[in-house]
């Protein structure tokens, strides 16, 4: 009798340990890859000086990395239907590390471009497969762990470029990149040793029937639209914020501090809003964050410099908080065995929006001025609210435990 009652408890404890190991491994991996993504901002001025590159070439380098990362996420999700996601994650991490290692050995702009394409291709595996692994490990309780996973990316964005800057004090940039490449290989080894198998994205079903792509339901597409617009608001505002603050009399150091306040608030928002979404629900949380974003943007426009600076951390919380709620909802609107495809499409859309939105808002700014363009970002945030109401109807239709089917 004791053994029969202990067995389920032991199985549950083992599953919990496995889920925690999955979250820890994917979190470390997320920090590494997001840090790799932002390393290029530190490196571009160095490469411009050493190789005599023009601004067009520098922009091309950034575009090649971002394009490889965004464009290969959906293929990575499909590959996970045939190969364990853990294996693909490890391979992607090794490839991203080797890309930066190759950059450290490059002697020309063409070599750097090739290295960045390789690194971007490696990083393309991380978002969809790691998110799906966390969602699968935690099942119905995945929303808060996905918020934590989302938060770890901000830790990487803050720490790894800063680490590179410190390394550059003591060694040439080529050696510094080698150090970071070896760090990436160490993360890959850590994942191989500690992360449980993630499983394949698609499992066999009775009669060999393949399941239709439920990830592309109407509810998912509404969630996708919210993600695209939310990213557009964030990237559009960040494009104009330095100029708005300078118009209020902010110096260059003050502008840098202001952006840091937004980013710190954003990291806190990613961490807390996943938890908040579990308690308030998706609709209320999205209405809170998007309404707060619109109010915060208008407050920054209307207030003098000092009060506007005080608003920025809270604006950062609202600006980034929605994303954790959205990522946590992806598994609820897709079949468990198709999470990789759903996350791949979702991340591709948000990354693409982050690339296109500043251009569109920039055209608006050229025509009507930065204030009008910034007001347009607030209007976009408000426009998300009716889409959230439409999404809520689809969430209410989900049966209990639907994400586990």
What is each PLM-predicted segment?
Residues 71-109:
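Conserved MFS/SLC helix-loop-helix module at the cytosolic interface between two early adjacent transmembrane helices
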Residues 181-204, 387-392:
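C-terminal membrane-cytosol helix-exit motif in multi-pass small-molecule transporters
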Residues 115-153:
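Cytoplasmic helix-loop-helix junction between adjacent transmembrane helices
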Residues 40-41, 218-270:
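Extracytoplasmic gate region of multi-pass secondary transporters
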């Amino acid at each position: 009798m004791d053994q029969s009652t202990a067995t389920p408890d032991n199985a549950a404890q083992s599953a919990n340990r496995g889920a925690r190991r999955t979250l820890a491994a994917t979190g470390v991996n997320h920090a590494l890859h997001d840090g790799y993504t932002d390393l290029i901002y530190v490196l571009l001025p160095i490469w411009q000086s050493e190789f005599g590159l023009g601004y067009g070439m520098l922009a091309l380098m950034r575009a090649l990395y971002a394009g490889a990362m965004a464009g290969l996420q959906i293929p990575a999700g499909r590959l996970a239907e045939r190969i364990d996601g853990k294996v693909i994650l490890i391979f992607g991490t090794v490839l991203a590390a080797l890309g930066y290692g190759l950059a450290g050995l490059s002697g020309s702009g063409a070599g750097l471009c090739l290295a960045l394409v390789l690194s971007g291709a490696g990083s393309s595996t991380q978002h969809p497969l790691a998110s799906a692994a966390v969602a699968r490990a935690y099942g119905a309780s995945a929303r808060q762990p996905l918020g934590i996973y989302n938060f770890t990316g901000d830790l990487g964005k803050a720490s790894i470029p800063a680490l590179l800057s410190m390394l550059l004090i003591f060694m040439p940039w080529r050696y510094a990149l080698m150090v970071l490449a070896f760090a990436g290989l160490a993360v890959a080894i850590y994942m191989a040793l500690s992360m449980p198998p993630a499983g394949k994205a698609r499992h066999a079903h009775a009669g060999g029937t393949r399941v239709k792509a439920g990830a592309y339901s109407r509810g998912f597409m509404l969630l996708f639209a919210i993600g695209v617009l939310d990213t557009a608001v964030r990237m559009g505002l960040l494009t104009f914020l330095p100029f708005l603050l300078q118009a209020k009399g902010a110096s260059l150091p003050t502008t840098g501090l202001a952006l840091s306040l937004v980013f710190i608030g954003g990291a806190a928002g990613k961490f807390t809003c996943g938890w908040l979404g579990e308690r308030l629900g998706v609709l209320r949380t999205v209405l809170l964050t998007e309404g707060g974003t619109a109010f915060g943007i208008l407050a920054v426009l209307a207030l003098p410099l000092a009060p506007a600076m005080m608003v920025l951390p809270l604006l950062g919380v609202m600006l980034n908080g929605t994303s954790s709620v959205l990522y946590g909802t992806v598994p609820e609107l897709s079949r468990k065995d198709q999470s990789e495809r759903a996350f791949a499409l979702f991340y591709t859309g948000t990354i693409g929006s982050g690339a296109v939105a500043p251009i569109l808002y920039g055209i608006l700014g050229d025509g009507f001025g930065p204030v009008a363009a910034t007001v347009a970002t607030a209007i976009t945030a408000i426009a998300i609210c009716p889409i959230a109401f439409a999404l809520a109807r689809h969430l209410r239709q989900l049966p209990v435990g639907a994400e586990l089917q």
